[in-house]
């Protein structure tokens, strides 16, 4: 299990390699999707922190506060003083698969995905924790899967 900041930093590095920039909102969604797919495919959480239901979808509060200085703009630097996920670790192919699936969407499109009928965000009270069990069940029932990532991270 990693901190959400560690996973966000990995996504920042992946985005830079692909010539893309990420906002706080987009990072929140990528971390959430990675966590959800990890729960569904590997049966274990990716991040240590709880995910909460906020206005624009699932949010990891500590990650939000670490990046809020960027507002809706581009996150230009990695979050300091957090451990890295080594690029040769089993987690990196998994994170790359999540990025390849969701990284090209706009923040608004990612919010729309998290707000779809039956999504965990809709099934809890605002500003409350979204239980990992609810997230896992939702991602297990999605028709699409992350190709080639079922064994990643094992």
Where are these regions (language model features)?
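Domain-edge interaction signal
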Residues: 1-154
């Amino acid at each position: 299990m990693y901190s959400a900041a560690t996973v966000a930093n990995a996504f920042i590095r992946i985005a830079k390699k692909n010539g893309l920039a990420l906002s706080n909102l987009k990072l929140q969604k990528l971390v959430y999707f990675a966590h959800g797919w990890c729960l569904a495919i590997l049966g274990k959480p990716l991040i240590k922190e709880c995910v909460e239901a906020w206005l624009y979808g699932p949010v990891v509060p500590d990650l939000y506060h670490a990046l809020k200085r960027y507002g809706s703009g581009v996150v230009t630097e990695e979050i300091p003083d957090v451990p890295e996920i080594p690029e040769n670790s089993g987690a990196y192919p998994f994170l790359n698969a999540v990025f390849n699936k969701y990284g090209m969407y706009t923040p608004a499109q990612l919010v729309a995905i998290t707000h779809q009928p039956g999504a965990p965000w809709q099934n809890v009270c605002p500003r409350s924790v979204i239980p990992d069990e609810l997230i896992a069940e939702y991602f297990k029932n999605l028709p699409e899967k992350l190709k080639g990532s079922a064994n990643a991270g094992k």
